Amino acid sequence: MSLMPFDDFYYPYQLRRRSPRWMDSTGSPWDSFATSRDWMTTPYSSTGIGRRDLSQDWMTTPYTPAGVGRRDLSQDWMTTPYTSKGIGSRNLSSWGSKSETIREMEKKFDELVRKVDRRFTGMLSMLDDPEPFARQNISVEHEGKTTSKTTKLQDFNMKVDVQDFKPEEVKVKVQGGQVLVHAKRENRDEGDGMFAYSCSEFKRAFILPEGVSAERLTSSLSRDGILQIDAPVAVAIDNKKTAVPVTVEHTK
C-alpha cells in the first residue's frame, strides 16, 4: 500500500503541522513538526524522522534484521541462500541429496564425452594413416594375395576384429567385386532426468582377387568377436607350357 501525502498527521498521538521554515539553522530539512509529504522523500533514520548521517551509506548497505544501518558484509549474506527464519547463512545439508544426483549426472556425461572422443579420434587417425589395419583397435588379417610372378590363385581369407559389436549388429555383403563389412551400435540411456545417446559404427571394403567366387563367399563370427570371411577360387589357371608342332615346308 503506497502512502499518500497529506498536510497533517498524528505522530505519535499528537497533532503536528509542517513548519513554514524549510531549512532551519542546523541545515536540517526537518523540524519537530513534519508532514508525510516531507518524510516520504527524505531518507528514513532508525532513530526517528529527521536528517541523518548519510556517511553510513544505509541506502547502499544491506538491511539487517536488527535495524537500518551498516552491517558486517563478511557474512556474505547476499550470496548466501535466504531462509524463512531470517536473513543470513543457512544449513546446506538439505542440498546433499540433490548435489549427489548432479555429480552422478556429470560423471555419466563426462564418460559419454570420453567415449565419443575416442571414437572420433580413431576415425581421424584412420584417414591419416595409410595402413590403418596394422595400428587400429579393429584388426584385419587378409590372406589370398596374388602376384604377377605366378598364375596360381589362392582362396580369399580375411579376419576382422568386431568384438565391440553384437552378432546382429554386423553385416557382410558382396557388391561390385568388393566385400563390404558394416557394423553399427546405438546406445540410449535415460534416467534421473537425463538422456544420453551414443553411436559406434565400423565400415570396411575389400576387393576380391581375380578368380575368387563371390557366390560361394561365407562369413562367421567367433565367440571372441572375430569375423571370419572366406571365398574359394572359382577358376584355376593352368600355367603348363604346351608344345605347338611346327611344320617346315621346303620349296624347290
UniProtKB/Swiss-Prot annotation:
Region (3 X 19 AA approximate tandem repeats): 37-93
Main location: membrane
Record function comment: May be a component of myofibrils where it acts as a stabilizer.
GO molecular function terms attached to this record: unfolded protein binding
Protein name: Body wall muscle protein HR-29
Organism the protein comes from: Halocynthia roretzi (Sea squirt)
Listed InterPro entries: A-crystallin/Hsp20_dom, Alpha-crystallin/sHSP_animal, HSP20-like_chaperone
Source species taxonomy: Eukaryota, Metazoa, Chordata, Tunicata, Ascidiacea
Cell compartment(s), UniProt: Membrane
GO biological process: negative regulation of apoptotic process; protein refolding; response to heat
Transmembrane feature ranges: none
SUPFAM superfamilies: HSP20-like chaperones
N-acetylserine: modified positions: S2
GO cellular component, one term: nucleus
Residue stretches of each Sequence repeat: 37-55, 56-74, 75-93
